[in-house]
């Protein structure tokens, strides 16, 4: 089987809900990143076998968001483009699928990642309107809440799954808020110091009557503090501890990588950034979906015969502070590694609590950020993982080249 390398990794800045990227569709966000990736590696688009796009909220976006990304990027009609939906894991699952296709010899060059415009998620009326009703009200459904943030089996919000982890592991409100403020501080430092500049594709976007250059993450909260976080009311449960301040955001953005085989690497004289060591996934009880990374990470460590302590950096998507702390607690116990070891190496430039969580893109976003940080620090190995609504997790291990 072929080794698989990543030769380019890019993303947009992450927009706030109804913020600067509101008027940019998911396909347009994805196309901008994909187009820049091909330019960066100086490769003709016709050499791309396919583009795989994670996307969770396609309603109202038009037929085939994945194919739209290809066409809007200006690629020839011969390049295949399609979508993948695995809720929060969609962007990483796209990368995993691309990796497995190249490893199996099916493809040589694939661009994979994810794109999401949560701001453009429409309101829906139920299918029964097609049948008609003699009387009574029709409910209007929020596509974004219903299809991305509500558990399909128990009808509970993702925030309640975080509260379930709080109960399981007795995680205090103070621990959650401290984790959240640390994420904010690291993210603000990274944005202000230009730490993300190499990975972000600048976009010209229209905001009101102005055209601005959108080239930085706009979600980090510069006005928050531990004191302010402590005043926030529980968001999902009357006596709970999960708040808007210690949970991830609702956001817009896109992130992609270019995957190539050994043969393509040599044929087109491409420079590798990292090699993919391995990938894996897991499924657990949907009611504690946030713990999905625990099993996924243990699976990929076992599959690749990797010692957890050989990892220099980790990107664990911060759906909720409680969820992140629950994952770290279980991993530290199961793998006999000190909790502080994880905290020192995880999300060194902040995570989704501060940067945001555009659901279809986040799995790819953490891979892109991990790659660039590994190159800056000359880290040998890194891991990215995230939880997935419905009770799943995905994980990927990368090796610096």
Task: Tell where the protein language model's regions lie, with residue ranges.
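Active-site-proximal alpha-helical scaffold in enzymes
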Residues: 86-116, 166-195, 256-263, 328, ...
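Flexible glycine-/small-residue-enriched beta->alpha junction loops
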Residues: 109-164
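N-terminal extracellular/periplasmic Venus flytrap/periplasmic-binding protein-like
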Residues: 10-12, 23-32, 40, 175-267, ...
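Short, well-ordered amphipathic alpha-helical segments that serve as non-catalytic structural scaffolds
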Residues: 27-41, 65-69, 94-97, 158-165, ...
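Condensing-enzyme catalytic core mediating Claisen C-C bond formation in acyl metabolism
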Residues: 1-24, 226-291, 295, 368-369, ...
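Conserved catalytic cysteine-centered active-site region
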Residues: 55-109, 153-157, 223-249, 334-365, ...
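Conserved beta-ketoacyl condensing-enzyme motif
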Residues: 22-89, 93-110, 114-133, 200-216, ...
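Active-site pocket-lining segment
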Residues: 161-163, 199, 207, 277-280, ...
């Amino acid at each position: 089987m072929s080794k698989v390398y990543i030769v380019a990794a890019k993303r947009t800045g992450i927009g706030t809900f109804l913020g600067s990227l509101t008027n940019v569709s998911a396909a347009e966000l994805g196309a901008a990143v994909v187009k820049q990736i091909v330019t960066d590696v100086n490769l003709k688009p016709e050499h791309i076998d396919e583009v795989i796009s994670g996307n969770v909220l396609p309603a109202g976006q038009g037929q085939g968001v994945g194919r739209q990304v290809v066409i809007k990027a200006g690629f020839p009609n011969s390049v295949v483009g399609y979508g993948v939906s695995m809720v929060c894991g969609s962007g990483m699952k796209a990368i995993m699928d691309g990796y497995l296709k190249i490893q199996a010899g099916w493809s040589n060059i694939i661009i994979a990642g994810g794109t999401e415009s949560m701001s453009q998620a429409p309101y829906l009326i139920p299918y029964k309107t097609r049948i008609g009703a003699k009387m009574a009200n029709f409910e209007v459904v929020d596509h974004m809440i219903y299809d991305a943030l509500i558990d399909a089996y128990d009808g509970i919000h993702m925030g309640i799954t975080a509260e379930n982890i709080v109960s399981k592991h007795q995680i205090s409100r103070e621990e959650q808020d401290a984790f959240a403020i640390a994420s904010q501080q690291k993210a603000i430092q990274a944005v202000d110091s230009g730490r993300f500049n190499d990975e972000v594709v600048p976009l010209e976007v229209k905001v009101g009557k102005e055209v601005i250059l959108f080239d930085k993450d706009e979600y980090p909260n510069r006005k928050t503090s531990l004191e302010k976080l402590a005043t926030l009311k529980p968001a999902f449960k009357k006596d709970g501890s999960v708040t808007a301040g210690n949970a991830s955001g609702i956001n817009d953005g896109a992130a992609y990588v270019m995957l190539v085989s050994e043969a393509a690497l040599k044929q087109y004289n491409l420079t590798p950034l990292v090699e993919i060591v391995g990938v894996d996934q897991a499924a657990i009880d949907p009611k504690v979906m946030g713990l999905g990374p625990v099993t996924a990470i243990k699976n990929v460590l076992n599959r690749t015969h990797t010692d957890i302590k050989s990892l220099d950096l980790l990107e664990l998507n911060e759906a909720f502070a409680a969820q992140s702390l629950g994952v770290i607690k279980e991993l530290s116990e199961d793998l006999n590694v000190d909790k502080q070891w994880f905290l020192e190496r995880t999300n060194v430039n902040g995570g989704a609590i501060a940067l945001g969580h555009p659901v279809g893109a986040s799995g790819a976003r953490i891979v892109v950020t991990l790659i660039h940080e590994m190159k800056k620090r000359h880290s040998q190995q890194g891991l990215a993982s995230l939880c997935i609504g419905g009770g799943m997790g995905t994980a990927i291990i990368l090796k610096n080249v």
